[in-house]
A protein has these predicted regions:
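Bacterial Sec-dependent N-terminal signal peptides
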Residues: 16-70
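Short beta-strand element of the alpha/beta-hydrolase
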Residues: 117-127
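C-terminal catalytic histidine-bearing segment of alpha/beta-hydrolase fold enzymes
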Residues: 303-310, 314-390
Length: 390
């Protein structure tokens, strides 16, 4: 099983190295991340970009001398000067000193003015082939304006973070948020997840394993929940999930990327099944609203993976099916989409979480939708787009 894991991880690394384009939607700047780990710290206050979660220009954090007493009681929290937002940085959800087990949290109120209100929360999981990436890079959505809190997490990466370690970390982050929900004004009954690429796959694992501690997949026992952190009595259940171009079937993924013989030996098949999100559909009795967003010209994780997840989910939950959507980005690659497409997705994603975490059922949804993307800005993506339009 370990040998096949190495094959899968090598496959993912090759995929990640093939296309490292910047994106208006998802920022996966590998060079910046490498610089951050060289210094062994994240200089979050030096970022001059817009505050992508709140939609406000990034403002200076007020000094500790003028923080309210309420904020002092919380871990690493400060007010933004020009918004009704509290940000809590570098919180370790695993009770360790590992920076790969930390989260940042934005709350849509000033702590001393929140009264007893609790907010739904969306947790973002970054991509990077389980080999790199950072919680500092996340989609540019205006969740706070819709009174939805937002968190972005790190998780352990390979070689330390092999499957299912990163799943255990993500579940620990959810349990930490639920265990501290009253303190941080979070609604523990309305937690959403979203992620791209590797983070999209991890989002799918979470969506398909609600309330499951362990499973047998092709005669192999898989520890789903893990025992990371102090909040083991809390639930890691989520209520809604969005998967951006995460893979469905590890075997198909590696066969496509490395030319592997699809007729793997029996031992390898066990491993590929265990690391395939599609293997977990139907295992939980508590399916959640699930959205898939995938580009038709994705050469890293082909569009076929999004369709496989959509079809398997549809077939499995014929009765009492939760909300299910497949958003197809025609001509779209592995992210790196044009501004018009990105702006449309902002509305789609915000509406999805408002509808399912705030129970606003008046907001309509479409089970399938196609957005035609313009040619991407980078040369390789533009060539793909041009080929598709011939």
């Amino acid at each position: 099983m370990k040998a096949t894991l190495l094959i899968l991880l090598t496959c993912i690394l090759i995929s990640c190295s093939e296309e490292q384009e910047s994106s208006d939607l998802i920022d996966t700047d590998l060079n910046n991340y490498k610089e951050s780990i060289k210094t062994n710290e994240y200089d979050q206050d030096s970022n001059d970009e817009d505050d992508s979660v709140s939609g406000n220009k990034n403002t200076n954090i007020i000094s500790s001398s003028v923080k309210t007493d309420a904020i002092k009681e919380l871990q690493n929290c400060s007010d933004f000067n020009d918004s009704i937002t509290t940000v809590c940085k570098e919180i370790n959800y695993a009770s360790t000193d590992n920076t790969r087990q930390t989260l940042n949290l934005w709350i849509p109120c000033k702590i001393n003015e929140c009264s007893n209100k609790q907010y739904p929360v969306v947790i973002h999981i970054h991509g990077g082939g389980f080999a790199f990436g950072s919680k500092l890079k996340f989609p540019k959505y205006n969740f706070l304006k819709n009174e939805i809190a937002f968190a972005s997490i790190n998780y352990r990466l390979i070689p330390q973070g092999q499957f299912p370690v990163y799943l255990h970390d993500a579940k620990a982050a959810i349990r930490w948020i639920r265990g501290n929900s009253s303190k941080y004004h979070i609604d523990p009954n309305n937690i959403g997840i979203m992620g791209e690429s590797a983070g999209g796959a991890l989002t799918s694992y979470l969506a398909f394993t609600n309330e499951i501690k362990e499973l047998i997949i092709d005669d192999t026992k898989v520890n789903i929940e893990g025992n990371v952190g102090k909040y083991l009595n809390e639930s890691s259940k989520i209520q809604a999930a969005i998967n951006y171009f995460g893979h469905a079937d590890s075997k198909k993924f590696c066969s496509a990327k490395m030319g592997l013989d699809p007729n793997c030996n029996e031992k390898s098949t066990f491993c590929f099944a265990c690391t395939s999100p599609i293997s977990y559909i139907g295992k939980s009795s508590s399916p959640v609203p699930y959205m898939i967003i995938h580009g038709t010209n994705d050469t890293l994780v082909p569009y076929e993976h999004g369709k496989l997840l959509f079809e398997k989910f549809s077939e499995t939950y014929l009765k009492n099916q939760p909300e299910l959507s497949l958003i197809t980005i025609q001509n779209g690659g592995h992210g790196n989409w044009d501004d018009n497409t990105s702006n449309k997705l902002k509305d789609i994603n915000t509406n999805f979480f408002v509808r399912n975490l705030k129970n606003d059922k008046e907001i309509p949804y479409e089970k399938t939708k196609t957005i035609i993307s313009e040619c991407a800005k980078t040369k390789s993506s533009a060539n793909l787009c041009n080929e598709a339009m011939k």
